């Protein structure tokens, strides 16, 4: 362990647990949790990863997010909290030594506005995750869909050790791209179509193609978003994701089904702010905000 890179993951929801499971064997990993109860359970029981019929139990080290000493020891920090939780941990991120690179893997684009607040001297990577994951409990994550992590350098530069660790697990591919805006906008576009629709309808992604009326609605939303966020072959890309994740519920659908706050403000609001000619997307946005209000989340 002494020669391995120290990698920390902030956030122990579905994505944080999935990334922890996949980085545990290639790094000296620490998972930072909001609740001490969860970090204690992870230290006692380990992390269980369910992948189809396979179940792995992985020994990991966990501690609370307020463990400043442990945070400052890391050589790479992956920020895996939900979009709406990011602002609450910004003061903590600002206190981390500037030599520690930060990799953000949030949904949406609202977090881009927060990057300048972290200063211009640290290395910041902006990424997206194509994986599907669901947290069963505090120590168990279900790998619902395999994909890639794509990232680009927002500012700064990477040392060889970090590049090597990101590229060292063929079962969990990480790709470097030239433009962070390109990868974020493409993921944002896809999420802005699939997530709110499935959240309102409370259906799996594949139903958006199977049901003729819902498919027409999907195509309408794609056309609207294209007017303010052009993405090449957008409809095809959205439909492919619906096909390959046909049996999955989107993260926003799962949030609604569990009466949790959604990431609607991070995913849809940045698009709505680009223009007014988006009536269907506006309607979906207000439907979900209204549902959140009814659930008092």
Swiss-Prot record:
GO terms for biological process: pantothenate biosynthetic process. One of its GO terms (molecular function) is NADP binding. The active site is at 187 (proton donor). It comes from the Bacteria. It is found in: Cytoplasm. Pathway: Cofactor biosynthesis; (R)-pantothenate biosynthesis; (R)-pantoate from 3-methyl-2-oxobutanoate: step 2/2. NADP(+) binds at residues 11-16, 107, 133, 263. Its EC number is 1.1.1.169. Substrate binds at residues 107, 191, 195, 205, 251. Pfam families: ApbA (PF02558), ApbA_C (PF08546). It catalyses: (R)-pantoate + NADP(+) = 2-dehydropantoate + NADPH + H(+). One of its GO terms (cellular component) is cytoplasm. SUPFAM superfamilies: 6-phosphogluconate dehydrogenase C-terminal domain-like (SSF48179), NAD(P)-binding Rossmann-fold domains (SSF51735). Its main location: cytoplasm. Belongs to the ketopantoate reductase family. Catalyzes the NADPH-dependent reduction of ketopantoate into pantoic acid. NCBIfam families: apbA_panE, PRK06522.2-4. This is 2-dehydropantoate 2-reductase. It comes from Listeria monocytogenes serovar 1/2a (strain ATCC BAA-679 / EGD-e).
């Amino acid at each position: 362990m002494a020669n391995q890179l120290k990698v920390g993951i902030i956030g122990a929801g579905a994505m944080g647990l999935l990334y922890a499971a996949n980085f545990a064997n290639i790094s000296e990993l620490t998972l930072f949790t909001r609740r001490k109860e969860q970090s204690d359970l992870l230290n006692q029981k380990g992390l269980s990863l369910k992948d189809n019929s396979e179940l792995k139990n992985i020994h990991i080290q966990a501690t609370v997010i307020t463990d400043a000493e442990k945070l400052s020891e890391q050589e790479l920090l992956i920020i895996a909290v939900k979009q709406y939780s990011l602002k609450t941990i910004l003061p903590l991120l600002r206190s981390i030594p500037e030599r520690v690179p930060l990799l953000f893997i949030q949904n949406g684009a609202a977090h881009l506005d927060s990057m300048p607040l972290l200063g211009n001297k640290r290395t910041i990577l902006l990424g997206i995750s194509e994986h599907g994951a669901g947290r069963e409990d505090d120590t168990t994550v279900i790998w619902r869909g395999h994909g890639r992590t794509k990232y680009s350098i927002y500012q700064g530069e990477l040392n060889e050790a970090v590049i090597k660790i990101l590229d060292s697990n063929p079962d969990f591919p990480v790709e470097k791209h030239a433009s962070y805006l390109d990868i974020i906008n493409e993921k944002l576009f896809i999420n802005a179509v699939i997530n709110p629709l499935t959240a309102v309808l409370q259906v799996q992604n594949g139903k958006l193609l199977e049901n003729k009326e819902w498919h027409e609605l999907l195509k309408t939303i794609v056309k609207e978003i294209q007017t303010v966020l052009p993405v090449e072959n957008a409809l095809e890309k959205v439909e492919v994701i619906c096909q390959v994740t046909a049996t999955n519920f989107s993260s926003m659908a799962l949030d609604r089904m569990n009466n949790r706050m959604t990431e609607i403000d991070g995913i849809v609001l940045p698009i709505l702010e680009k223009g007014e000619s988006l009536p269907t997307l506006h309607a979906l946005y207000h439907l979900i905000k209204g549902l959140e209000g009814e659930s008092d989340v």
